[in-house]
């Protein structure tokens, strides 16, 4: 997914500015990867109604904010995730631009796997955990990841009488 081109606050932009930023990001994705992303994680999690309804992207935020950008402390990031409770179906916000976050990730990935978690893309999470297809102009945010009840597996659904 995209995180925008200029890392500007998309929620404070009008539609023309949002589209210009998205077009610049799309051009770069197309040049480097040969495709454009279907997902957008807006910087700061900031969005407005215009972005939600006209971006043509699925907008994804997070359900656990490590605040790695604030502390820049690997140990605090690790402890925060380890103490966050049940992480099943959660999206953990991390910023790879900080060395401390990279160091925290080197600890967290093995720990998460040892705890039995499976690491998947956001699209896979939405489909596998919640049974939804990723839809353009839909927002997947804290409430979606924290409070959406996953569907029961087919074998546990009672048969109709």
Model-derived segments and their meaning:
Residues 1-4, 38-42, 58-63, 90-94, ...:
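Structural recognition of the beta-strand scaffold that forms the well-ordered cores
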Residues 31-37, 116-119:
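Surface-exposed helix-capping loop/turn segments at secondary-structure junctions
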Residues 8-35, 46-88, 101-104:
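Alpha-helical scaffold elements lining the catalytic groove of polysaccharide deacetylases
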Residues 88-95, 101, 112:
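Periplasmic/luminal catalytic loop of GT-C fold multi-pass membrane glycosyltransferases
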Residues 4-6, 14, 44, 96-98, ...:
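A mature extracytoplasmic/lumenal domain signature
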Residues 10-11, 92-94, 150:
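A short, structure-level motif marking secondary-structure boundaries and short turns
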Residues 100-161:
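C-terminal domain-boundary segment and adjacent tail
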């Amino acid at each position: 997914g995209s995180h925008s081109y200029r890392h500007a606050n998309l929620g404070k932009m009008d539609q023309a500015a949002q589209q210009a930023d998205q077009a610049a990001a799309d051009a770069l994705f197309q040049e480097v990867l040969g495709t454009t992303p279907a997902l957008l994680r807006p910087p700061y999690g900031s969005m407005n109604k215009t972005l939600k309804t006209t971006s043509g992207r699925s907008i994804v935020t997070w359900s656990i904010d490590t605040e790695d950008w604030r502390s820049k402390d690997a140990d605090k990031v690790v402890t925060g995730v380890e103490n966050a409770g049940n992480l099943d179906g959660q999206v953990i916000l991390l910023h790879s631009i900080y060395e401390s976050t990279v160091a925290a990730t080197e600890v967290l990935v093995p720990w998460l796997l040892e705890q039995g978690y499976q690491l998947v893309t956001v699209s896979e999470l939405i489909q596998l955990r919640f049974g939804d297809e990723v839809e353009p102009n839909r927002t997947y945010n804290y409430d979606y990841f924290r409070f959406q009840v996953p569907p029961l597996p087919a074998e546990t659904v009672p048969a109709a009488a």
